[in-house]
Amino acid sequence: MRVLVSGGGTGGHIYPALALIREIKKLNPEARFLYIGTENGLESTIVPKAGIPFQSIVISGFKRKISLDNVKTVMRFLKGVQDSKRYIRRFNPDIVIGTGGYVCGPVVYAAAKLGIPTIVHEQNSVPGVTNKFLSRYVDKVAVCFEAAAEHFPQSKVVMTGNPRASEVMDQNGMKGKRSVGLSLPKKSVLIFGGSRGARPINDAFVEAIEQFGNKSYEILYVTGEVHYDKVMEAVKQKGNPNNVIIKPFIHNMPEVLTGVDLVVSRAGATTLAELTALGKPSVLIPSPYVTNNHQEKNARSVVDKGAAKMLLEKDLTAETLIRDIDEILLDAQTLQNMKLAAGQLGIPDAANKLYEVMNKLVKK
């Protein structure tokens, strides 16, 4: 099978694509890949580092307001379609999949026009502009949230989940806890604000640190590398309790996620896919700075099923943070109910499900 993949801009579009590629390599070692992205996106460094052939096209996203820039964007889109057709003809894929971000627009559109089987994968509960546009032309739209399905033609929608979920399975949670200094018998909560950290969460944590020192559970706090020194400076003035461990970054996140009892985090699509696959209860603090407020809608999908609590950033204080953690971790029945609810939402074999959809299209 020859697979052409496109997606970029943010890790949320790139990492699911890489997880899918790794799964296909396991199931079909003869498979060949080409990844098309932009020169300036994260994908231009991440994808080649993963050993996957990479080509770039020049493209930009549409402004949401009427603008002269949109005229340039249309011109770039048309040029991107022509460049994509050239790469597609040269690579001769059996199937093309777009994982979101404006770069996959011309690539997947070009493939559809050339009669090649096409899929888009939508990670969020609120679809991006590019995937909504492409849904008119592709064969299938793979989604991760039920809420996303209503935005697409129903005959094309398949619920596959996020391939990243598959990569957190079969991890050693005890090893994960030991690696960061958590004790095995105690309950623990992991608090983090995404790969780069989040200042409002850092501020609430610093305010709460003295009260955390009185708790029976342990706290693992991840600041994000850029915030670490500032947080540690503030913590030094208040004192760092023995049951609070602070790290700038965690390199073995799947192991650590498996080991802890509760997670406090943003509500990005990849994070929620991993948490539900593992059956982890969570307190979700959606980022209010994302397009279409999609993180709050992602969180709502999990909260409504009883698998998480939602704490809006505007309501985030030391008191509300501790309150929500205590209500879950200190109540065995609540913790158990939320574990079950999260597990029912999870799709741990998401990468395999997406590969099956691809296989069916190729064999048609």
Curated annotation (Swiss-Prot):
Keyword Transferase: yes
CDD domains: GT28_MurG
Pathway(s) served: Cell wall biogenesis; peptidoglycan biosynthesis
Root EC class: transferase
EC number(s) reported in the record: 2.4.1.227
Cellular localisation: Cell membrane
Function as written in the Swiss-Prot or TrEMBL entry: Cell wall formation. Catalyzes the transfer of a GlcNAc subunit on undecaprenyl-pyrophosphoryl-MurNAc-pentapeptide (lipid intermediate I) to form undecaprenyl-pyrophosphoryl-MurNAc-(pentapeptide)GlcNAc (lipid intermediate II).
HAMAP family, per the entry: MurG
Keywords in alphabetical order: Cell cycle, Cell division, Cell membrane, Cell shape, Cell wall biogenesis/degradation, Glycosyltransferase, Membrane, Peptidoglycan synthesis, Transferase
Protein name: UDP-N-acetylglucosamine--N-acetylmuramyl-(pentapeptide) pyrophosphoryl-undecaprenol N-acetylglucosamine transferase 1
Organism annotation: Bacillus anthracis
